[in-house]
């Protein structure tokens, strides 16, 4: 149901990771990403591609936070979706290569119908995420 891969540059200073899922399994909020091809003792900046989500993806759940009722498929929903986009999760960490490869990165919890924020992943059916890892100078992080 889930697949991921990671490819690193020849000098192991940069890597790109990709994770995807086929179908959502209810109440499985935990996810961990494991990199590969990194230097064990190098420090890396791990971050994700920032996403914006259309409010249509939330369906009727948008009414939990909307000041007015928005009927699914209505003109109001159509107009609101043109102007309102919700920020996706932010994954931004600094860690050693061996940590990223062997312990992995615990990703933000998945959305479970309530409590959406930048600390929650909206990870629906057939969703995917890109993660970037770049070697940084260890002295810059002190």
Predicted regions and their residues:
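Carbohydrate-binding surface patches
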Residues: 1-41
């Amino acid at each position: 149901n889930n697949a991921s891969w990671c490819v690193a540059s020849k000098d192991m200073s940069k890597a790109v990771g990709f994770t995807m899922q086929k179908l959502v399994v209810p109440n499985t909020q935990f996810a961990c990403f494991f990199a590969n091809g990194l230097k064990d003792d190098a420090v890396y900046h791990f971050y994700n591609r920032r996403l914006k989500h259309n409010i249509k993806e939330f369906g009727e759940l948008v009414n939990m936070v909307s000041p007015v009722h928005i009927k699914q498929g209505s003109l109001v929903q159509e107009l609101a979706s043109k102007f309102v986009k919700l920020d996706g999760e932010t994954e931004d960490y600094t860690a050693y290569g061996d940590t990223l490869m062997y312990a992995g990165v615990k990703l933000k919890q998945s959305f479970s119908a309530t409590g959406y924020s930048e600390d929650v992943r909206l990870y629906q059916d057939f969703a995917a995420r890109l993660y970037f890892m770049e070697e940084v100078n260890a002295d810059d992080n002190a």
